[in-house]
Amino acid sequence: MKVLLLVQKEQRAILDRLYEGIAEHCDCDTRWLSSAEQRNLRGYFRREVDVTQYDRIVFFLRFKQEIRQAGFIRTIPNLVILEHDAYQNYIPCKYTGKFSAHYRRLPWARVISSGFVVSQRLREEGFEAVFVPKGYDQALLQPQTRERDIELAFVGSTNSVAYSGRKALLDELAQVEPLVVTRTKSGEEYCATLNRIRFFVSADVGMGEYMIKNFEAMACGCVLLAFDQGEAENQALGFKDKVNVVFYKDIPQLQEKLAELRANPQLAADIARNGQELAVSQFSFARIGQRIVEVLQPPLRPRAPLSLLETLRLKLGV
């Protein structure tokens, strides 16, 4: 299968291993698009892409730019959209309902969502949505033999509106527990910091799915204290409470379970080990890339014929 994979050149997360994981399992032409190229997809395709050469054209671009160009995107054959932010469709933020509105203009496109329940909800709306979770960079994030001298911590951003629930929970927890909240550079510093943390607090409040940090912390051997996203999401990922992760729904429950783990270091060590084994076997970008290619394979829904205006604009390149 010949795949054109269009990704963002300027992206905070380092996802090169994910793209390599996809390329391992298909004939993949990966292109890194600048912000300017993403803003003018019609021009980019006119200059750089022969759509007849590809069995699948996969977008992993900024949603903000996609929604402004749905008229052109409708004309692209064999379209698949890889989307890690579709949970924002269902939470109070500037993109509430916007993903549904966008996909209604592209009803034949396959959407690969990183949330199990999100993909279910999209399917209920009539879209062809499939689930492949987020993962972690197996080359960058590995366990080290350093001392875990930070007992309880969160590493990452709390700034955006989508993270307002995260910030509120972490602020509340910091009032009653010795929580460290910090940020690091990507890469070695991030890996080293995760390897110093015994209990990693994941606070994906109100998001309905697990963000990438959960898998990164598990891979580095932290005990993951995860805000519970519900039975369906947990089952889809193989997450089991006090077996490979520790779930909580509020601060009192988190404190109760934390006290149990402090009193039983062997239980904590077992959970960390089981979580790490699950992450390594199921959530490395090598494995996630393979899963993405698997869901690219089935035939796509037939695309509606182009209108006369769409055909004319394609021919004229305007």
Model-identified regions with their sequence ranges:
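Ligand-binding pocket scaffold of soluble enzyme catalytic domains
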Residues: L5, L18, I22, F154, ...
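Non-membrane alpha-helical structural segments and their capping/turn regions in soluble enzymes
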Residues: A101-H102, C191, I251, P265, ...
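Nucleotide-sugar donor-binding catalytic core of glycosyltransferases
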Residues: M1-Y54, F59-R74, N78-L237, G317
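C-terminal amphipathic helix plus adjacent low-complexity
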Residues: L258-L261, P265-V318
